[in-house]
Structures are given as C-alpha cells and as structure tokens.
C-alpha cells in the first residue's frame, strides 16, 4: 500500500512538474542577476510556456498561464495583465506552429521561438513605454532575448526527456487500470 502511494505521489509530481516550474519561476523572478553579470538573464517562463504549449500538454492550461502572468506582474511591479498578455501571445504562436507543422523539428521550433519572443517582447515593452512610461534598457532586453533563445534548445532537450517519462507513466497507469478490471472479472 505504501509503495503504491509513493508511486502515485511520484507520478503526480512528474505530471505536474511543468506547472510547478512555471509558478516557481514567476514567484522568484528566475534570473541570474545575483551573479553580477550585467546582461546575462533569460526568461525561463517563455521557454516553459512555448515548449509545453507547442507539445500540447494539457497540464499547463491557459488559465494557469494567465494566473502565472498575474503573479509575475505582482513580483516585477508591472501593471497587472501585461505578463499575462505576453504569455498568452506566446501560447498563440505555439498553437499556430503546432497546427501547421507536419513534421516537428527542434531546429525549426527553435527559430520560430526566436520570432515569437521578439514579437512578444516588442508588444510587451511597447505597451509598457506607451501607456505606463516605464524606462527600458535595450541592452538588457537584447541580452535577455539572446540568452532565452540560446537556452531554449538546451531546455527543450530536457523537456523532451521529461515528456517521454510522462508518456510512459500514462501508459503504465492505463495498463494498471486494465489489470484491475481483469481481476474484477
């Protein structure tokens, strides 16, 4: 009984890991600014949202993404809804790519991700400048975009491994259900 309970907790943790990572990254402003590298930062929520929206995982739903954006605005001190809009724009681009893609390719996804974060950041910072008169350091934004783009490839590799583990877990749970049904018959 306890081993079954432990495995069910592990399965649940692995299934909800992208959601846990999303909220952990928006709550603590996942960044490497504490290393005192002036222009080294990357936007982990962009990578996470684009990848999991592209791969059609239902765990990371649009409602959770919207709420994570609201939390991100509160942490960063941005006007409410700006990050949510940016995150949903990224979801829209990922959904479009998912629907038009015949053969998925990490390399093509990677360059489409660059286009996506350029558009999303442009809209985000345009709104911040136009309506809220927030000063923007373009060198920091450029560094953030470049490092986010470069790190997408690395994180996509690890997310692919995690996705394969999740698919095995889902198939195992279906097999367990079939075995339980057979025992009842």
Q: Model-derived features: where do they sit?
A:
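Terminal, non-globular segments
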Residues: 1-185
């Amino acid at each position: 009984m306890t081993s079954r309970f432990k495995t069910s907790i592990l399965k649940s943790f692995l299934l909800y890991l992208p959601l846990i990572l999303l909220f952990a990254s928006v709550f603590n402003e996942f960044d490497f600014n504490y290393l005192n590298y002036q222009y080294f930062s990357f936007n982990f929520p962009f990578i996470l949202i684009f990848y999991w929206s592209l791969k059609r995982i239902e765990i990371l739903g649009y409602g959770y993404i919207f709420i994570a954006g609201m939390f991100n605005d509160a942490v960063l001190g941005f006007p409410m809804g700006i990050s949510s809009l940016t995150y949903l724009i990224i979801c829209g681009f990922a959904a479009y790519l998912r629907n038009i893609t015949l053969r998925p390719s990490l390399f093509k996804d990677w360059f489409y991700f660059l286009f996506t974060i350029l558009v999303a950041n442009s809209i985000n910072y345009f709104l911040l400048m136009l309506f809220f008169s927030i000063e923007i350091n373009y060198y920091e934004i450029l560094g953030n975009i470049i490092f986010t783009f470069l790190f997408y490839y690395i994180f996509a590799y690890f997310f692919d491994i995690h996705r394969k583990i999740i698919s095995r877990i889902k198939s195992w749970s279906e097999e367990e259900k079939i075995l339980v049904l057979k025992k009842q018959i």
